[in-house]
Amino acid sequence: MTGKEMFEKLGYEKTCHDEREIIYSIYSDNVFIAEIEFDLQNQTFYCAFLDEALEVGMKTLKAINQQCRELGWL
């Protein structure tokens, strides 16, 4: 299963993919809830829940790790 498929299974949708970043976001009733952003230039990622840090569960961590593998970071 790809990182994108794993994120989609968790309810995320890919909202951006360009030369600088990949962003997966979750919305509830069209209201932004959380996002995971991969910075392709700096090979970093961050997780945000509204304006705070996002608690990352093991299924989400597995999706993050899979995406990092696909990007060649791991």
Predicted segments with their positions:
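Acidic, low-complexity, intrinsically disordered interaction modules
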Residues: 16-61
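Negatively charged, low-complexity tracts enriched in Asp/Glu with abundant Ser/Thr
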Residues: 1-24
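Short acidic DE-rich linear segments
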Residues: 69-74
